[in-house]
Amino acid sequence: MKFGNICFSYQPPGESHKEVMDRFVRLGVASEELNFDTFWTLEHHFTEFGLTGNLYVACANILGRTKKLNVGTMGIVLPTAHPARQMEDLLLLDQMSKGRFNFGVVRGLYHKDFRVFGVTMEDSRSITEDFHKMIMDGSKSGVLHTDGKNIEFPDVNVYPEAYLDKIPTCMTAESAATTTWLAERGLPMVLSWIITTSEKKAQMELYNEIAAEHGHDIHNIDHSMTFICSVNEDPEKAESVCRDFLSNWYESYTNATNIFKDSNQTRGYDYHKGQWRDFVLQGHTDTRRRLDYSNNLNPVGTPEKCIEIIQRDIDATGINNITLGFEANGSEQEIIASMERFMTQVAPYLKDPK
């Protein structure tokens, strides 16, 4: 079993940027002290939904403060920056951390990112797939090459060389299209915390079928699952503190992107729009209903309840790499206390999939 801590770097109402950044750093250090395997970061721009716009810089800070903790991105918004620049950042972190950096990517969901950085949002899937292949191939060969599909430049040698033979990578996968693309290449995917156990199981079945058809060993691919987590002997307190955080967090999320508005005609995001329509039909756009939905899917409550929920998804998916977000627990002291309760009262009792 492996356990990660994901930090959203969200700015709750009433908190300053300095408070959010100080907490981000301390949670990274605490992750090593509590024996988490990985500390994960997320990229966001121009919104209080997340203050870490440059994950290479953020990860370098945490890597420099720790000795054994892996630090990763979940993920880099790949289409919005030049692949050569990203590859140099990636390789430098890989070398300076002696292989402790994990390169996780996403295609991006926030329209302002694409407008400001000068990228067509409707091309995000094609660019993400293209750039990811270029970077991963280049990390092995030492040469960055493009076929001119989305960007064109002459072949260049990239430095430094990779510290590891194979740089750890992953990609958040929500749609069938992304799942299929990753499966064809045998690449690890990250499963969302907002889908049900049956949906996770179906996603893994699709992935495994396609990956096996393409000759990949499905038992040797390091997928991960994400959860929102609050561990407390008082289940009502755990649910209450998550509600207080998530009600503001959800509002910030929907305000950060216009993809869910009826007037939005951006192509290429049919899965996300369909998921939102399902939420509307089920009443989950109502804040209370959506918080109930989230708490039912995620390990929020007593240690026993948290074990039951996570183990259920482990057995359904075969995934034993678990990533948890603890920021919904309130103050920094309460967040770290919940992290500690998880590592002492939940993690030791989780078992590899049946």
Curated annotation (Swiss-Prot):
PROSITE patterns: BACTERIAL_LUCIFERASE
GO biological process, one term: bioluminescence
Any GO molecular function: alkanal monooxygenase (FMN-linked) activity
Top-rank EC class of the record's enzyme: oxidoreductase
UniProt keywords, alphabetically: Flavoprotein, FMN, Luminescence, Monooxygenase, Oxidoreductase, Photoprotein
Function: Light-emitting reaction in luminous bacteria.
Protein name: Alkanal monooxygenase alpha chain
Protein source organism: Photobacterium leiognathi
